[in-house]
């Protein structure tokens, strides 16, 4: 596949702001000023991500909760991922699917995919995220497209988290029923990125960076962003993720924007990398800052986090939660019978019904679907 270039200045703007971001320069006055505003500037967002803002977590949480209730009410959206292949052509040193890792590989055929979809649909879920390893050879666009057509038979909302593709490919996938695209930049530090991604198309930083914009050019309704917090300086990566989403929202105001906040987790046969530890308090700070800077964006909290943390954060800032998650291949139905190994370890293994009931006990409203398709 020839990697498409698009005419966009967003990457240069994000990298420039990230390089100039000195999070140790902010004062108590900067934090208080940001918290007194209804709408944050970029500098306000930077202030709330600073170490100094850790002293204001209670105030940030209160403000974030007010913002969440203003724009989302008490709704919490529920979805689940479905991994259909774990073959990968990339060598990302931190990932369980990387091409050098000796794991059990598998790719579901269409009969197995449909069996998985049927089983998941019995839970009442109406949104699903289709995931593959990043291998065009084993997971072609046509294969993914057919899988998404099957998914639309059972689910109202279908998202994908696959390798980045060109605009025409996104248009094709949209015609197969795909609504939104999730791409994690992993880290926005290009030099660190080179050290972590050693083989495959993922080595090309700029192509991955522009994926969300190509997806919107390819008629997708929404896009999701995320850095894998802990790979590098997490404050700069958190800022860059939010600023990237902010600039794309300004350029494409019709787009639905989502932010994910994953932290680095153990994987099978993982080699030692220079991990930047991110505490739960620091992750909570980041999520609150995202909510205040991007009030209309969905914020997804991953099963990489434990159940107690997830339950707390959906009451304050996050709006979307995964349930019934297994990152292995063929993990949901007896027909598929767990054919391939997991991408990473998860911390919250609750079922859909368990999370559904927990949300209700917190006086929140679990939502399976909020989008209606109108046929011509």
Where does each model-flagged region fall?
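Generic structural signal for well-ordered alpha-helices
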Residues: 80, 117, 144-148, 170, ...
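Catalytic cores of alpha/beta
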Residues: 166-175, 232-246, 306-316
